[in-house]
Amino acid sequence: MNIYLRQNSFLVPDFIAVQRNSFSQFLESGLIQEISKRNPITNSTKELELCFYPQYYKLSPPELNAKQSILKNKTYSCRLYIPVKLTNKRTKTLKLQWVVLGNLPLMTKRGHFIINGSPRVIINQMVRSPGVYFKEVSHADQKLTYYADLIAYRGAWLRIELDKKADIWARMKKTPKLPMLILLQALGLNLPTILKSLNYPKFFENLGHDGNFMKQLKKGRVSSRSSSQELSGSFNLSEDVSLRLDDSSKNMGAENVQRAPLQKSTKKATLFGDFSRSSVYCKTQEEALWALYALTHPLKNPDEVTANLGKSFLYRKFMNSRVYDLSPLGRLRLNQKLNLSVNENITTITAQDLLFITNTLINLNYGVGKVDDIDNLKNRRIRTAGELVQNQFGIGLLRLEKIIREKLKQQQTKLSIGSLINTKPINGALREFFGSSPLSQFMDQTNPLAEITHKRRLSSLGPGGVNRETAGMAIRGIHPTHYGRICPIETPEGQNAGLVNSLTIYSRVNPYGFIETPFYKVVKGQVQNSTRPIFFSAYQEEKKLLAPGDIYANKLKYLPKSELPIRKLAEFTRTTREKIDYISVSPLQMISIATSLIPFLEHDDANRALMGSNMQRQAVPLMTAEAPVVGTGLECRVASDSGHVLQAKKSGFVTYSSAEKITILSPVDSTPAVPKLSKGNNSPQHFHESVGGSCKESQSLQAAAEGYLSGVASSSSSKFTGSSFSTISALNDGVLRRALTQKVLTTGTNCSSMLKNQRFFVEPKAQLYTGAQTPVGRVETILQPNHAEGYLSEVETIQQTQNKLPLQVRFGVEAPKSSFDSEATKISSTLNSIPQHPVLGEDSPSKQVGWALKDPQIQTMLKPKWHHSAQTMSRENWYQNLKGQNVKTFTQVESGRLVTKPTNTKMPMSSLAGTANSKKTGEALYKLASSESATKSMDFSTKTQLKPITYELQKLFRSNQDTSIMHRPVVREGEWVNRGDLLADNSTTVGGELSLGKNLLLAYMPWEGYNFEDAILISERLVSDDAYTSLHIERYEVEIRETKFGLEQITSQIPDEGKLSHLDHFGIAKPGTWVEEGDILIGKVAPMPQKNLSRYEKLLYDVVGKKISTTRDTSLRVPRGVSGRVIHVEILNAENLPPEFVFEGPSRVNLYIAEKRKIHVGDKMAGRHGNKGIISNILPRQDMPYLPDGTPLDMVLNPLGVPSRMNVGQIYECLLGLAGRYLGQKFKVRPFDEIYGPQTSRSLVYSKLYEARLRTGQRWLFNPASPGKTRLFDGRTGECFSQPVTVGQAYMLKLIHLVDEKIHARSIGPYSLVTQQPLRGRSKHGGQRLGEMEVWALEGFGAAYTLQELLTVKSDDIKGREQVMESIQKNKTISLGTPESFKVLIRELQSLCLDVGVYAVDGSGKIKQVDTMKLP
């Protein structure tokens, strides 16, 4: 049951849309843009020209589908074809040809890529938006200086800075700084124009120019104002160059010195240091260009510097659109920041840009204006997967262009397009990106939540981003603009904290890459939630007064009169409702998907909520999934959007259902094509087509299918708030009869789901009519009545003349809907769902529609006497129950898969009044408000053709993390399903609801120290009932290699091996075989050199009758501790073998083993509130504490884990879960429920516990003296514990940190070469290592001998290791040696030139130095 009704219903965007939309954008426009940038490619003489036509490109269908690509270790990709034209202007010839540019990896429907058989995700990168940013620097003397960074989308960065002396400079990478005036003049601005454009022209009051300046510059003189005799920014010179300061002894101390000329003794090199004043300027642009090049190239001979060199330098750096690109966004941001009106198509730097940046910097110096906050989201944008792939594709094209230009240089007489274009550059660039980029990550497939979170992740790391070592707290922190855009809770622990984030539920990324979040307009204190919400980026919301989403609005949608909390910019204040501009659409708006799955989130500390969010992603899918009793309502959306559950693409009749496939018979759609709509989830969408006319948004549309009732009885009398409606729903007879007798027929949650087999009849005189009109908001498909849809659909004729039942037709596409717990929720969900974006709340956007009776005399209604269930009815029962009824029947003709509809079968029935005669042909009339109408005839006597749609189910499929992915069918043969209905569950869903753990009965109490420090005590029931048993699928790979003596071979002929019955003729274990430790999985032999046997050995072989072995066994065997069943074998071709090798049998084999893992001591478990722990003991169920009704507990947790962690939400959850256990109810509790009043959570929990006490008669369930606590009994003694204990039912998860993968033992293994200590880690077969804290612990216990043993012979005492065994065997005392690490330490100190040695005292008392390497 849903506890709290949402006030505002708003569509939740598709969770994977950020990935799919970006790649779709790349295919539609990005790819064309990148190729157009390199178009055309010419040689130096412009005679040869290669031109692409990117708008006509084509993609070939992939050779393998996504599943086959994973099994065969291939990339899921397609070939990119493009027409290319080669023009030779000298010979006036032209060639046109389609060529392959390369293989383009494709994104799957679920939003990831498959590279070399591994699913990978391109995560979204958060970078600084192109534009200009003004910052300030505080110096030690409390003086502030300012600088501006001009960041381009692609190209060199430019910094313009003001120093302490109020000089203004321009800096570029790898070049000395230069005066800003020279740069502005080089761009074509003269001095009067510059000064007129400045708000404070007096900034350059000391501006001066004398005629000797250029002469001195050309002679190699520099100006310096430094009181020191050294030049600032001087360079090291070669020996044959010497510089001296003229008159330095006279002038260096003077303050008025502007220039000190330098004389050089040779002309071989020229040195320019920093100019002391940036106010140096030139008379002409030519001089400025000369000075610009001379200053940026200080080692260049002045005689070789020309103004053209300066011009080409400027063009190369900032004016060439192929090299420097601000992007349209960067131009837009520059125009906004500097109040410019430069055309958006100009994406290079203009003189106007730099002039106004200089003006802004000078204004800041005078205290006018403010600096930018780089952490504000208006200054940061998202580079989505499509954009990252587009950039990498552009790099590949750049490489291709270089190759083509090189080939065009070679004057070949016969140039062909095929010889010019090679697929390697683009393939290589894409392979680099997908294989090695930090933004291309191995997809986290532990469960659907982990997958969907991984695809919505935002990273500030990667190329063009920040470095985790140097990132400070400012960039990691939470900014006010993160509200509704970036989750403040979900982020990793450790060094990536704050650098890797998640998108919130409602956020979306706009075309520019900025994150937007929705708000409702507030007019005079009233929330306008019936209109479409408005999406704001951080820049757009700056001047708005925004209220949070957890403010309660009354039934008239008015906010409270008291002062309300609001946010404007970064300030949080309070104000009255009349001043509020906008309000958030939901309290959940500020958190991410994983965080929104935590019930009672508002009662948890943020640090623990972070852990809870992260640990849900680590939950292992269990063999028997169980939905949570206490959820938040978003579980279905996560399962649905992840793409793991199977949903019906079209409505139809289930003809076959098994664990392998489901077949649905659907009617062939003969309706007109759906009009193409404009893109964007919330952009205005209108009718582009309609039957017989068009309709604008402002017009009203009324549609009546006169004469027929098509099983439709609901529509909307208000505007659509987000999209069109879902599956057409019919009334069952009871609701209809009740509604008709009450003279008003309403929709909403009263309406039942569609029962295709129910028919009703009314008296001929009775006539229904409707006066409701439906204003069209945004409609996603053409208007059409649901005539003759599906196997069980049938249109009943009510009357012919005035006795017609007009019908308000519902229009729209059906939405994918995941699952339903009961008929009631299915009814509600069917009526309330919205296409693409199912409604989060329970308040449906469809309002009531009035159906009135013109003639209320209803004499008889036919009430069918058969039992029905929502939307499902087996065909057999349906036919049996129709016998004797005065209704139409129809039969199925299997040949051709057609359905025919014969005439009425009339049989006497006394309880039925007169019914209308049937009519074979009817008319469906569409009426528009503009009086345009069209009549469409439909002949219902024709046959409806049906088409089977087959859905393949995944069966024990391996994920990236070795967990199992499998489908379980939930529909049976004979059922009718509508589009979007659930067909098959995943291994982590129940009824389409995400189910990652189990509901366990637990208590918070200490138990014999077994739950000390977060340890967990569990019942043996969880092991015996396989409650936490999970399936894991391991992949084993074998590939034959070439050895020194020949080629290996996969075969069943294995020498000296008897147990081979489970192998096939190739020597590979058969699918379905149970294998255990040591069994052969794949038989493989390697050739061996021939042995030179003596005559006696040969005779022995002859006597025994055994052949001399020429091969040795190198078979793949089941590893230690593993046992399972072989579920799949994939035979592949080896890629690294030369083609000339000829061999028998397969060359490469992948074998999959499914293994069951029960829960063990050492496994990690966790709740949803960050309460985690390791299982310390498994008790027999009879020893576990038990409740007053005799029920033993499943788990015992430490009560001290709650107060200090401040995650009290787990207490609310377990108490409400206990109430749900005894009431048989499930709860969906939205976080932040204090909107309904103070202590709402506590009131809910107590009221439900009290209700459970009343219903069950169990008085211990709610004790007012100690609510939530009860008396427990010790299972060992039967005695009652002295104190009441908090008992409840919580949802606990088993995490992927399994002890089976971590437990490790070593007797003999590898040692480190330097320290001679055992290696670290299970993967390297490492051993025990003692660190500082371990040594302290042993010292604290006084275990001196144990400590010495661990630090010497068990660690790195080489000689001691060899002597221990001998000493034990001969009963000698064990000698004490020197650890190798001590010798390494001495040698390291000696290598640092420190005189460190080891000394010993001999018998005579003398001190002798001992050689370190000869220490015992």
From Swiss-Prot:
This enzyme catalyses: RNA(n) + a ribonucleoside 5'-triphosphate = RNA(n+1) + diphosphate
Q: What is its EC number?
A: 2.7.7.6
UniProt keywords, alphabetically = Chloroplast, DNA-directed RNA polymerase, Nucleotidyltransferase, Plastid, Transcription, Transferase
- Gene3D superfamilies hit by this protein: 2.40.50.100, 2.40.50.150, 3.90.1100.10, DNA-directed RNA polymerase, beta subunit, external 1 domain, DNA-directed RNA polymerase, subunit 2, domain 6, RNA polymerase alpha subunit dimerisation domain, RNA polymerase Rpb2, domain 2
Classification via CDD domains: RNA_pol_B_RPB2 (cd00653)
**Domain of life of the organism encoding this protein:** Eukaryota
Subcellular location per UniProt equals: Plastid, Chloroplast
Tell me, in one coarse class, where this protein mainly resides: plastid
Q: Which GO terms describe its biological process?
A: DNA-templated transcription
Class in the EC hierarchy, top level: transferase
Extract the signal peptide range: none
Q: Which GO terms describe its molecular function?
A: DNA binding; DNA-directed RNA polymerase activity; ribonucleoside binding
Q: Which PROSITE patterns match?
A: RNA_POL_BETA (PS01166)
Pfam families, A to Z:
RNA_pol_Rpb2_1, RNA_pol_Rpb2_2, RNA_pol_Rpb2_3, RNA_pol_Rpb2_45, RNA_pol_Rpb2_6, RNA_pol_Rpb2_7
* Ribosomal protein in keyword set: no
Question: Among the entry's GO cellular component annotations, what is one?
Answer: DNA-directed RNA polymerase complex
Family, as annotated: Belongs to the RNA polymerase beta chain family.
> Which HAMAP family has this protein been placed in?
RNApol_bact_RpoB
- Give the protein's biological function: DNA-dependent RNA polymerase catalyzes the transcription of DNA into RNA using the four ribonucleoside triphosphates as substrates.
Q: How does it assemble?
A: In plastids the minimal PEP RNA polymerase catalytic core is composed of four subunits: alpha, beta, beta', and beta''. When a (nuclear-encoded) sigma factor is associated with the core the holoenzyme is formed, which can initiate transcription.
What is the protein's given name?
Answer: DNA-directed RNA polymerase subunit beta
